[in-house]
Amino acid sequence: DQGGDLVVTLTEGNADLPLILSDYHLIVQPNGGFDKLDAAIGTGPYKLTSYQAGVRATFEKNADDWRDDRGFVDSVELIVMNDTTARIAALSSGQVHFINAVEPKTVRLLERAPIVNVLRSSGKGFCWFLAFCDTGPFDNNDLRLALKYAVDRQAILDRILGGFGTLGNDYPINANYALAPEDIEQRAYDPEKAAEHYKKSGHSGSILLRTSEAAFPGAVDAAVLFQESAKAAGIAIEVKREPDDGYWTNVWNVQPFVASYWGGRPTQD
């Protein structure tokens, strides 16, 4: 309106509106971006100065930021380093100030480093093995159920993720969401049930699972553990480690069965 306030008119009630307004997909553009698609005013503490997809992005302080309690450095540079060893080396040498996606098996080591502070937080994201349900052999529900019962989630959480997380249950809503379901029984590792569904599926031969450390920290080891637990059900999983570089372009959402990661959203809707 004329007073400088943003007015949102809804066609129906939406209790999640305040949270939806905080989603990073929501942007404000002059005339809705119809005049110039890449035009934006921006309300954050930094302005984008350069961007190379899959390489780096640089930012400079926004002198017109409407808040004075943030943006305390003059510039920020985000560098893409898919290789875990390279990220840790960059942090340890002082080349970078922060890294994310630390492998659980290296957390204890980093905690002993005098110049490193390890920060933990619970989140809404999750690690998973995704399959194209419209592509064979994964278009067979019995095969999908066989794989779900053939994965030892607790073993992956304990042995691969170092206990940093909670068990997933084949849907994307965890306890960090306000409306997380509490009445759905946890699906547990059950090689007998897995074998039963696998037999019903009529499938034979190995199943190719593609993975990479780019998917999530420990993704390669998790895939190998999945392979081992599935053997007890008579299911042969072939694990193929893909290069970290190019994984999100060449493998994820391209190949039918892959390791992946999904970030959280403001609400479960």
Protein language model annotation of sequence segments:
Residues 20-71, 75-77, 83, 196:
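Gly/Pro-rich hinge or "lid" segments in bacterial periplasmic/extracellular proteins
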Residues 166-200, 216-219:
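Structural transition elements
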Residues 87-88, 96, 106-107, 143, ...:
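Short, hydrophobic alpha-helical packing/hinge segments within bilobed ligand-binding/sensory domains
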Residues 3-9, 44-45, 72-75, 92-93, ...:
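Alpha-helical secondary-structure segments
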Residues 108-120, 253-257, 268-269:
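Ligand-binding "clamshell"
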Residues 228-269:
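Periplasmic binding protein-like
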Residues 64-109, 228, 236:
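Ligand-site clamp/hinge motif
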Residues 1-29:
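Surface-exposed binding/hinge segments that line
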